C-alpha cells in the first residue's frame, strides 16, 4: 500500500514541509517588494523630470502610479508579516510536539518502572534485610563479648603492673629521701658504723611498708 499511495508523512515531516513552503513564500514576497521599491524610486525620478518640463498631465498620471505602487509595497509588507506569524506558530507547534513526544517517552519509562517495582517483593526484601541486620548485630555483639572475656585477664595484669610500678616509684622516692639523710663516705668510720644499724632498720621498715601495700592491693 505504501508503494502505491506513498508513505504517510509524520506530523514532524508535515510541519517541516509547511515551514519550508512559508519560508519560500516570504523570500518571494521580499523579492517582489524590492522590485516595487525600485519602481517607486524610478517613478519619483520621472515625476520630478516631468514637473521640470511642465508636463503636469503626465505628472498626475505618474503620481497615481506612485500611490498604487506604495500601496502594493505596504500590502507585501503586511502579507510577509502574516506569513511570518504563521511560521512562528508552526515552529511553536513543532516545539510543543517535541515536548509532547518527550513527555510520552518519560511516561512510558515511568509506567515500565511502576510495573517492575512490585511493592510486596520490595517489602519482603526490606524485612529480610532487617532480619539479617539484626542477626549480624547479635553475632557482632557476641564476638565482642568473647574478645573482651579473652582479653580481660591481660588488661587486669596490665593495670596491676601499672599500680605496682606507681607504688615502687613512690617508694623509690621515699628510699631516696631516707638515703639522703645517711652520712657521706667522707665522714668518720665510727660515725658511719654507728649509723649503719639505723640505715638497716630504715630499709627494713621500707621493705615492710612495700610488702604491706602489695598485700592490700591483692586484697582489693
Swiss-Prot record:
Job description of the protein: Probable core component of the endosomal sorting required for transport complex III (ESCRT-III) which is involved in multivesicular bodies (MVBs) formation and sorting of endosomal cargo proteins into MVBs. MVBs contain intraluminal vesicles (ILVs) that are generated by invagination and scission from the limiting membrane of the endosome and mostly are delivered to lysosomes enabling degradation of membrane proteins, such as stimulated growth factor receptors, lysosomal enzymes and lipids.
Keyword Glycosyltransferase annotated: no
Subunit structure: Probable core component of the endosomal sorting required for transport complex III (ESCRT-III). ESCRT-III components are thought to multimerize to form a flat lattice on the perimeter membrane of the endosome.
Keyword hit for Cell membrane: no
Motif (MIT-interacting motif): 208-218
Gene, per the UniProt record: chmp2a
Signal sequence annotation: none
Biological processes annotated in GO: endosome transport via multivesicular body sorting pathway; exit from mitosis; late endosome to vacuole transport; nuclear membrane reassembly; protein transport
Residues forming coiled coils: 12-53, 198-219
Gene Ontology cellular-component annotations: ESCRT III complex; late endosome membrane; multivesicular body; nuclear envelope
Protein topology in the membrane: Peripheral membrane protein
Keywords: Coiled coil, Cytoplasm, Endosome, Membrane, Protein transport, Transport
Compartments where found: Late endosome membrane; Cytoplasm
Record-linked InterPro entries: Snf7_fam
Main location group: membrane
The protein's name: Charged multivesicular body protein 2a
Family per similarity comment: Belongs to the SNF7 family.
Annotated region described as Disordered, given as residue ranges: 196-220
Amino acid at each position: 500500500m505504501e508503494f502505491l499511495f506513498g508513505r504517510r508523512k509524520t506530523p514532524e515531516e508535515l510541519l517541516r514541509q509547511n515551514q519550508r513552503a512559508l519560508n519560500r513564500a516570504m523570500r518571494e514576497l521580499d523579492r517582489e517588494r524590492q522590485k516595487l521599491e525600485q519602481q517607486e524610486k524610478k517613478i519619483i525620478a520621472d515625476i520630478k523630470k516631468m514637473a521640470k518640463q511642465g508636463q503636469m498631465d503626465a505628472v498626475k498620471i505618474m503620481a497615481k502610479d506612485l500611490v498604487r505602487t506604495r500601496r502594493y509595497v505596504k500590502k507585501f509588507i503586511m502579507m510577509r508579516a502574516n506569513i511570518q506569524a504563521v511560521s512562528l506558530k508552526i515552529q511553536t507547534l513543532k516545539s510543543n510536539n517535541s515536548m509532547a513526544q518527550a513527555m510520552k517517552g518519560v511516561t512510558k519509562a515511568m509506567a515500565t518502572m511502576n510495573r517492575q517495582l512490585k511493592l510486596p517483593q520490595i517489602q519482603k526484601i526490606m524485612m529480610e534485610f532487617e532480619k539479617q541486620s539484626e542477626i549480624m548485630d547479635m553475632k557482632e555483639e557476641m564476638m565482642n563479648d568473647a574478645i573482651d572475656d579473652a582479653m580481660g585477664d591481660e588488661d587486669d595484669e596490665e593495670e596491676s603492673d601499672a599500680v605496682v610500678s606507681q607504688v615502687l616509684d613512690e617508694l623509690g622516692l621515699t628510699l631516696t629521701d631516707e638515703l639522703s639523710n645517711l652520712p657521706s663516705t667522707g665522714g668518720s668510720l665510727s660515725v658511719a658504723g654507728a649509723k649503719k644499724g639505723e640505715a638497716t632498720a630504715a630499709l627494713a621498715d621500707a621493705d615492710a611498708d612495700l610488702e604491706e601495700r602489695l598485700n592490700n592491693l591483692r586484697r582489693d
